[in-house]
Regions:
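ATP-binding/phosphotransfer module of carbohydrate and carboxylate kinases, centering on a glycine-rich
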Residues: 1-115
Length: 115
Protein backbone atom coordinates (compact mmCIF):
# COMPACT_ATOMS: atom_id res chain seq x y z
CA UNK A 1 0.00 0.00 0.00
CA UNK A 2 2.90 2.41 -0.52
CA UNK A 3 4.93 4.02 2.22
CA UNK A 4 3.33 4.20 5.64
CA UNK A 5 4.19 6.51 8.48
CA UNK A 6 5.36 4.79 11.69
CA UNK A 7 2.11 5.78 13.43
CA UNK A 8 0.14 4.09 10.64
CA UNK A 9 2.13 0.87 11.02
CA UNK A 10 1.53 0.90 14.78
CA UNK A 11 -2.19 1.57 14.29
CA UNK A 12 -2.47 -1.27 11.78
CA UNK A 13 -0.64 -3.61 14.15
CA UNK A 14 -3.20 -2.82 16.84
CA UNK A 15 -5.99 -3.83 14.46
CA UNK A 16 -4.31 -7.18 13.81
CA UNK A 17 -2.68 -6.56 10.42
CA UNK A 18 -0.15 -9.44 10.23
CA UNK A 19 2.51 -7.54 8.28
CA UNK A 20 2.29 -4.52 10.58
CA UNK A 21 2.42 -6.80 13.63
CA UNK A 22 5.61 -8.42 12.32
CA UNK A 23 7.12 -4.98 11.71
CA UNK A 24 6.30 -3.81 15.24
CA UNK A 25 7.61 -7.07 16.75
CA UNK A 26 10.84 -6.70 14.80
CA UNK A 27 11.20 -3.08 15.90
CA UNK A 28 10.67 -4.07 19.55
CA UNK A 29 13.22 -6.88 19.29
CA UNK A 30 15.82 -4.55 17.75
CA UNK A 31 15.02 -1.91 20.38
CA UNK A 32 15.60 -4.53 23.10
CA UNK A 33 18.89 -5.67 21.57
CA UNK A 34 20.20 -2.11 21.36
CA UNK A 35 19.02 -1.23 24.88
CA UNK A 36 20.80 -4.34 26.17
CA UNK A 37 23.97 -3.43 24.28
CA UNK A 38 23.89 0.02 25.87
CA UNK A 39 23.63 -1.54 29.34
CA UNK A 40 26.80 -3.50 28.60
CA UNK A 41 28.61 -0.49 27.11
CA UNK A 42 27.65 1.90 29.91
CA UNK A 43 27.54 -0.57 32.80
CA UNK A 44 23.98 0.51 33.59
CA UNK A 45 23.37 -2.45 35.91
CA UNK A 46 20.74 -0.58 37.95
CA UNK A 47 18.38 -0.38 34.99
CA UNK A 48 17.28 1.35 31.84
CA UNK A 49 14.50 3.90 31.46
CA UNK A 50 12.72 3.74 28.10
CA UNK A 51 11.54 7.21 27.18
CA UNK A 52 10.20 9.08 24.21
CA UNK A 53 6.95 9.50 22.40
CA UNK A 54 6.76 5.97 21.04
CA UNK A 55 7.12 4.19 24.39
CA UNK A 56 3.61 4.93 25.76
CA UNK A 57 2.04 4.15 22.38
CA UNK A 58 3.92 0.87 22.04
CA UNK A 59 3.93 -0.23 25.67
CA UNK A 60 1.78 -3.30 25.13
CA UNK A 61 3.81 -4.30 22.08
CA UNK A 62 7.04 -3.90 24.05
CA UNK A 63 5.64 -6.08 26.85
CA UNK A 64 4.54 -8.89 24.52
CA UNK A 65 7.36 -8.85 21.98
CA UNK A 66 10.91 -10.12 21.93
CA UNK A 67 12.15 -6.93 23.62
CA UNK A 68 13.23 -8.57 26.90
CA UNK A 69 14.53 -11.71 25.21
CA UNK A 70 16.82 -9.67 22.97
CA UNK A 71 17.65 -7.30 25.86
CA UNK A 72 18.86 -10.22 27.99
CA UNK A 73 20.40 -12.49 25.31
CA UNK A 74 24.00 -11.30 25.62
CA UNK A 75 26.08 -14.47 25.67
CA UNK A 76 28.05 -14.90 28.88
CA UNK A 77 26.33 -11.81 30.31
CA UNK A 78 22.79 -13.19 29.87
CA UNK A 79 22.32 -14.14 33.53
CA UNK A 80 23.40 -10.67 34.67
CA UNK A 81 21.20 -9.00 32.05
CA UNK A 82 18.19 -10.91 33.35
CA UNK A 83 18.50 -8.94 36.59
CA UNK A 84 18.70 -5.51 34.91
CA UNK A 85 15.29 -3.82 34.91
CA UNK A 86 13.91 -2.02 31.88
CA UNK A 87 11.28 0.53 32.85
CA UNK A 88 8.94 2.47 30.58
CA UNK A 89 8.47 6.15 31.38
CA UNK A 90 4.91 7.06 30.46
CA UNK A 91 4.60 10.47 32.15
CA UNK A 92 3.95 13.16 29.49
CA UNK A 93 6.63 15.51 30.89
CA UNK A 94 9.43 13.47 32.46
CA UNK A 95 11.98 16.21 31.80
CA UNK A 96 10.03 18.65 33.95
CA UNK A 97 9.79 16.10 36.75
CA UNK A 98 13.54 15.55 36.60
CA UNK A 99 14.26 19.27 36.57
CA UNK A 100 11.96 19.82 39.56
CA UNK A 101 13.59 16.98 41.49
CA UNK A 102 17.02 18.38 40.71
CA UNK A 103 15.95 21.84 41.89
CA UNK A 104 14.58 20.43 45.15
CA UNK A 105 17.77 18.41 45.72
CA UNK A 106 19.93 21.46 45.00
CA UNK A 107 17.85 23.60 47.37
CA UNK A 108 18.11 20.97 50.11
CA UNK A 109 21.87 20.71 49.62
CA UNK A 110 22.24 24.50 49.77
CA UNK A 111 20.06 24.72 52.89
CA UNK A 112 22.01 21.90 54.53
CA UNK A 113 25.36 23.56 53.79
CA UNK A 114 24.17 26.86 55.25
CA UNK A 115 23.05 25.26 58.53
Amino acid sequence: PGHLKPADVTARALTGDPQAMRSVDLFCAIFGAIAGDLVLIQGAWDGVFLTGGLVPRMLESLQHSGFRQRFEHKGRFSSIMGRVPSLAVIHPNPGLLGAAAYAVDAECATAGAAA
